[in-house]
Amino acid sequence: MAPQTSNLWLLLVVMMVMSQGCCQHWSYGLSPGGKRDLDSLSDTLGDIIERFPHADSPCSVLGCAEEPPFPKMYRMKGFIGSGTDRDNGHRTYKK
């Protein structure tokens, strides 16, 4: 029974690979063989830019302030760490 099951799985895998390998996928603006028309590509990029005029900077899209969030996290980590060190009796001395 084991050889029949393994043969069935092998047949299914081969059929799946063959079905994906024999298909031709078409996309908007693509010619057969994967050759692209460069004029339509620039038009497509222009359309994308026109649809998102507010996306000039990452902060305008994400709504963040001028300062990235990473320094804030490190300052918060240092603040929390210094508080827990004091609670445990540790002191930090600056030179």
Curated annotation (Swiss-Prot):
Extract the InterPro entries matched here: GnRH (IPR002012), Gonadoliberin (IPR019792), Gonadoliberin_I_precursor (IPR004079)
One Gene Ontology cellular component annotation held by this UniProt entry? extracellular space
**Does GTP-binding appear among the keywords?**
no
Q: What is its main location?
A: secreted
What residues bear Pyrrolidone carboxylic acid in this entry? Q24
> What is the annotated signal peptide range for this record?
1-23
Using the record's annotations, give every residue carrying the modification Glycine amide: G33
Keyword vocabulary terms for this entry: Amidation, Cleavage on pair of basic residues, Hormone, Pyrrolidone carboxylic acid, Secreted, Signal
- Where is the protein situated, by its record's location annotation? Secreted
PROSITE patterns xrefs? GNRH
GO MF entry, a single one: gonadotropin hormone-releasing hormone activity
Q: What biological function has been recorded for the protein in this entry? A: Stimulates the secretion of gonadotropins.
Family of this protein: Belongs to the GnRH family.
PANTHER family xref list: GONADOLIBERIN, PROGONADOLIBERIN-1
Q: What is this protein called?
A: Progonadoliberin-1
The organism's lineage? Eukaryota, Metazoa, Chordata, Craniata, Vertebrata
